[in-house]
């Protein structure tokens, strides 16, 4: 039995865990307090590994980042950044229009408040930026962690190849630990679902359903409205034939592989059939698999604002704009890690003074809905890589 279970994919295991958790909560509610340990251990493991993960991942990515010599790379990168920002803005609007409530353990956290003005926000950001790096990691100050990782990463771009390789090896090692933690997600989710449904009842299903609708609806809006507008402005023509071709041939594959990196060969093959210059595609598509994460920006923004709404924190327009930028930057570090966008939610939550403990509960909620969220997110991310690359190449041919 255990051997059969071990052969199942993580998605299948999570689905089974959710069904079992709901079943236990409805049939044996008195047992659920004993199952809470599984969820607590899972959240504790995520809390422990998240700070060092963000630090090492961002540092290594920047230290080893090399820009190619393709003349078309800059406009592709511009589309990547603009696309992610607009995706984050769309997520803000969707979250405000359809606010979601999460079931969180918020004991002693009911007095949280967002900064009152833009000056307060910038002051808090600056104070977080210049935090002691060791203290930032130990206290899970993700803004400080991000600042030190970016600074050290930029400095290490001029270091020897051996040093860069060491950083890359450390990054791979931390990622391996994350994979081990994620492997225990079904057990943790089983405990979390059982306790949540025993405490809140079937109303929890409605909450998760609304959250999923907001997430998936925003991603569809980005794929079918935002991206076509950007592509249409780029190629000065009807974008939808290209958009639908990329969604069909790249998005569907990415939906089931749930990995932008694994979908790179599919995108390169599609780019070749679309007649894209190989010197452009060979750089921009692998680069896009690393940094172009519009779906991740949506996930980070929606779940962060759902947390803010749950805690009753008031936010103004300036804070939301900063959140969109933070979500975009965080999304760039989401590649290559199972559940990467979910594990970077604490970075955005820290903007509102939300503790790491609550942020990790939100990550756990994200794990529960990740069966659909992660697949759709990857489909959007990966199809956008080849879409924007092809659009810039078409524009280049028009100008030549």
Swiss-Prot record:
Compartmental location: Cell inner membrane
Gene that produces this protein: sstT
GO CC field: plasma membrane
SUPFAM superfamilies registered for this protein in UniProt: Proton glutamate symport protein (SSF118215)
Protein name per Swiss-Prot or TrEMBL: Serine/threonine transporter SstT
Entry-linked Pfam families: SDF
Reactions catalysed, as given in the entry: L-serine(in) + Na(+)(in) = L-serine(out) + Na(+)(out); L-threonine(in) + Na(+)(in) = L-threonine(out) + Na(+)(out)
Family to which this protein belongs: Belongs to the dicarboxylate/amino acid:cation symporter (DAACS) (TC 2.A.23) family.
GO biological process per UniProt: serine transport; threonine transport
InterPro entries, alphabetized: Na-dicarboxylate_symporter (IPR001991), Na:dicarbo_symporter_sf (IPR036458), Ser_Thr_transp_SstT (IPR023025)
Bridged cysteine pairs (disulfide): none
């Amino acid at each position: 039995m255990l051997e059969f279970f071990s052969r199942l994919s993580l998605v299948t295991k999570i689905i089974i865990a959710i069904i079992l958790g709901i079943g236990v909560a409805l049939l044996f509610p008195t047992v659920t307090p004993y199952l809470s340990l599984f969820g607590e251990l899972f959240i504790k493991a995520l809390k422990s590994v998240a700070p060092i993960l963000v630090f090492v991942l961002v540092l290594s990515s920047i230290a080893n980042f090399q820009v190619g010599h393709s003349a078309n790379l800059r406009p592709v990168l511009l589309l990547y950044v603009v696309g992610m920002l607009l995706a984050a803005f769309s997520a803000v609007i969707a979250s405000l229009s359809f606010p979601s409530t999460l079931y969180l353990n918020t004991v002693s956290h009911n007095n949280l408040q967002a900064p009152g003005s833009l000056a307060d926000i910038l002051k808090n950001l600056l104070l977080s930026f210049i935090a002691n790096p060791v203290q930032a990691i130990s206290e899970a100050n993700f803004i400080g962690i991000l600042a030190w990782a970016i600074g050290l990463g930029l400095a290490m771009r001029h270091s020897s190849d051996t040093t860069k390789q060491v950083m890359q090896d450390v990054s791979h090692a931390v990622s391996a630990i994350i994979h081990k933690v994620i492997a225990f997600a079904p057990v943790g989710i089983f405990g979390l679902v059982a306790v949540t449904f025993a405490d809140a009842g079937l109303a929890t299903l409605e909450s998760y359903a609304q959250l999923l609708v907001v997430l998936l609806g925003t991603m569809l809006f980005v794929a079918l409205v935002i991206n076509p507008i950007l592509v249409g402005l780029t190629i000065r023509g009807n974008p939808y034939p290209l958009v639908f071709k990329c969604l069909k041939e790249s998005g569907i594959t990415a939906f089931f592989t749930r990995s932008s990196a694994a979908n790179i060969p599919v995108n390169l093959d599609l780019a070749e059939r679309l007649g894209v210059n190989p010197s452009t595609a060979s750089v921009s598509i692998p680069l896009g698999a690393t940094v172009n994460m519009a779906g991740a920006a949506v996930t980070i923004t929606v779940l962060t604002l759902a947390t803010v709404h749950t805690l009753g924190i008031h936010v103004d327009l300036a804070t939301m704009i900063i959140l969109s930028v933070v979500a975009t930057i965080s999304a760039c570090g989401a590649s290559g890690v199972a559940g990467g966008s979910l594990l970077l939610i604490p970075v955005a939550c820290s903007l509102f003074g939300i503790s790491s403990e609550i942020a990790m509960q939100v990550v756990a909620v994200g794990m529960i809905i990740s069966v659909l969220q992660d697949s759709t997110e990857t489909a959007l991310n990966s199809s956008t890589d080849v879409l924007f690359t092809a659009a810039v190449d078409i524009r280049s041919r028009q100008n030549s």
